[in-house]
Amino acid sequence: MQKRYPSDNIKIILGGGPKKTEGWLNLDILPIPEVDIVCDLNQGIPLPDNSVVAISARHLLEHLDDTVKIMEEIWRVAKPEAVVSIKVPYYASMGAYQDPTHRRFFTEKTFQYFLPHKEHRTVPDYHFRAEFEIVSIGYIWSARWVRYLPFKSFFRRHFLNIAKTMIVELRAIKN
């Protein structure tokens, strides 16, 4: 049985597992006490359209079957201007490939697919209807000393294991 949470400011964590955050609903496939709504996110997000003001997906997208489908679901449940925070293994990190349950790999270009301005795309438009704005892209570096490297952008693009995680903040665009 799923709990009901009446609120105008619903915030959700997708795939939060045992990590409970005060004030946020935790949606996960695991039926454990910290999970508020047990669901398979491959099948969608069991919340109404335009009902969520903030969405967090930490190390989840790489495990799901269809990135486009989950992004459409995130957009569907997001209110206009909702903030979406995504944390994924960076494609050039060993951790991205080490885990055999990872189905997808992510770069900065991955999230350009979801921009409203289609000229940023280098791949065909498959009639994706959800639109996001990229607010910021950041990284968690593989070692402390990397913070002090000059030209981090160059090293990140041309060498393995400089950045281990990419953090992307998006904003849902709805008319």
Give residue ranges: language-model regions.
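Conserved alpha-helix/loop element of class I SAM-dependent methyltransferases that forms part
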Residues: 1-9
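A generic fold-level signal
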Residues: 6, 19, 162-163
